[in-house]
Each structure stands twice: as C-alpha cells, then as structure tokens.
Design a protein with these regions (language model features):
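Acidic, metal/ion-coordinating pockets
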Residues: 1-150
C-alpha cells in the first residue's frame, strides 16, 4: 500500500496559495490519500476572516478537500463562539488540549480522528498552542508536563 499525506500549515489566509494547493492535490490525490491542515489558516489580517469570523476560510479549506484540520493559535484568536461555529461547518477540527474557561471541551472540536485506509487505521491528533484570554491553558500545560517537556 502506498499512501500520500498532503499537509498544509500556517497558510495565514493566503487564499491564492490554497487554490494552487487544492489544484495540485486534486490532480495527484488517490482515494486512500489524506489531506491534513495543521492550523493557522484563519489570519485576522484578511477581510474574509474578519467578516465571517473564520467561517469563510474554513469553507475554502473544506472545498479544497481537507480531511481534518488542527486548531492553531490563529483559529484560537477567533475566540470560542466563532471557533465553535467554524467547527459546525462539517469539517473535522482537532484539538486535544483546549477548553473553555470552565474547562469544558468546545462543541464540534475533537481531540483526534481515526481514518481507515486500505485496512490500516491512522490516528490523527490535534494539539493547539495557548495564546488566548478566552481559553484556559490548564490542559495544555498538563499535557506537556506529563511528557516532561515543559
């Protein structure tokens, strides 16, 4: 079995790059391949992101064929309510370590997803950096302390 994982990160609302990336993947992608984004898609420097609070950017990435995306610090900048709305756009948004101020997971955001490809299961985990007043760092810090990485 040959599987290609297409991966993007830190696109920072450079949508002209997304169009080129999507065209390349569409031309080369096989059914079993994965397309993952590692976050920082929704940069507030862009009017599309500002006006739609990230939903426009998420729809563009979804249209490009992404299988899942991690929540990056730029998505966290959208704050909880907008982030939950983005997750409601029928896209797998991943973060195993962010919660709201009451330490509850955010609706629509899961820590991981399993993809079955050619009889093999692939676990994809999303981990987000902490940069926002509206999200608590507790789980993030504990996660890395447990790994003796802090």
């Amino acid at each position: 079995m040959t599987l290609t994982i297409y991966q993007t990160n830190d696109l920072h609302s450079n949508f002209e790059n997304i169009a080129r990336i999507a065209a390349y993947i569409k031309d080369h992608r096989k059914k079993e391949d994965l397309f993952l984004d590692c976050g920082d898609l929704c940069d507030l420097k862009d009017i599309t992101v500002q006006g739609t609070r990230g939903i426009g950017a998420v729809r563009i990435l979804k249209h490009a064929g992404v299988d899942a995306m991690a929540v990056g610090n730029n998505e966290i900048d959208l704050e909880n309510k907008s982030l939950v709305k983005c997750a409601g756009e029928d896209i797998k948004m991943l973060s195993c370590n962010i919660t709201d101020n009451d330490k509850n997971p955010l609706d629509g955001i899961t820590g991981s997803v399993i993809f079955n490809r050619c009889g093999v299961r692939f676990l994809v985990i999303g981990i987000s950096p902490y940069y926002s007043k509206s999200l608590k760092p507790g789980k993030y810090n504990v996660f890395f302390q447990m790994g003796n990485l802090s």
